[in-house]
């Protein structure tokens, strides 16, 4: 299933061609693209130039790389934690170096060294070790024109919260 806007556009156009309703497919894409561009524009006001580290044990992070880039964020590191679910050879975006076997220790070292604005990961981080804003990458992201965008909206909101919430003082 398509997670990103661009994947969904290709999917809709292919289906429209199969069913010989290209005009309806194009109309749907145009309608959704207008809304998508508006939403991306709002998000970019908050994300352009922000630095992010991406660390995943999930099967495919290409959709995360795509939406993060589209929102103008700088990807400092992207890596796969060891996992039986990996599909490293199926990555659609290959212009950055994705680190295979990215260890948790290396992730914490990179957080300390590069001080990113945000870490996106599939694992819970030790807040005392990480001391960084981080968001979870869903194993089953939303699909469709606005699938990846919904995750990006959530991650954007994390950028403006405190690094450590008050309740954590009691842990």
Give residue spans per PLM region.
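An N-terminal assembly and electron-transfer interface module characteristic of large anaerobic redox
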Residues: 1-171
């Amino acid at each position: 299933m398509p997670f990103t806007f661009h994947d969904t556009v290709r999917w809709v156009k292919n289906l429209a061609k199969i069913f010989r309703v290209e005009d309806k497919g194009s109309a749907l894409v145009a309608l959704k693209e207008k809304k998508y561009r508006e939403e991306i524009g709002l998000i970019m006001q908050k994300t352009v130039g922000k630095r992010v580290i991406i660390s995943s044990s999930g099967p495919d992070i290409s959709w995360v790389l795509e939406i993060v880039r589209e929102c103008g964020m700088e990807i400092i590191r992207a890596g796969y934690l060891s996992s039986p679910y990996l599909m490293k050879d199926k990555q659609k975006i290959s212009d950055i170096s994705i680190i295979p076997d990215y260890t948790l220790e290396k992730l914490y070292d990179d957080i300390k060294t590069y001080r990113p604005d945000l870490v996106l990961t599939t694992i819970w981080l030790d807040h005392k070790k990480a001391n960084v804003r981080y968001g979870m990458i869903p194993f089953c992201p939303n699909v469709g024109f606005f699938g990846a965008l919904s995750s990006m909206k959530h991650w954007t909101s994390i950028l403006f919260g405190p690094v450590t919430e008050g309740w954590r003082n009691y842990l």
